[in-house]
Amino acid sequence: MKKYFLLACALGAFGVADAATVQFSRPDKKLVVTVADDGGRPVYRVDYGETTFLAPSPLGLLTNIGDFSQGIALQESSFAVSPVSGHYELPTIKRSKVDVQATKAVCPFYEDGKHIFDVVFHVSDHDVAFKYKMYPQGNTLCCVVKEETTGFVLPQGTTTFLCPQAGPMGGFARTSPSYETSYTAD
């Protein structure tokens, strides 16, 4: 019953009852990602527990072979979710031994019945990452991304810490941009 309630809330949040919508989470069920095609525009949303972390936010690409930010549909029947687990070690990072437990979700988008791209999500207990996987279109051998329309919409009242981005090749030993620049609370 809770699963149906969450799905109904997600559909209402996107404002389109007939939009294709998929939802996936980590095994702890706290971090939930919802992907939909809101009137032909791909969007995603991230919730953590009862809190909206990212409101419905745009996905998409403008390329030399087409505008894939609108007029496309999420293909629910081809949606796939699988667990990811692994271990790696890097001696030069703060936590040198890392165990990975995550969920991989492949969200396929189509235009006029043709597979355009997948948005491949990697969701762990406290992280969300995604990438685009493009598919060949006709005889075009190369797809050039002219603009990415991906964005994120923070909920009303969100507070953040913003850090100015240093220009490249500046700072000590020309190592900028670095993450040690000053920041102020908003």
Q: Language-model segments: what does each one mean?
A:
Residues 4-13:
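Sec-dependent N-terminal signal peptides
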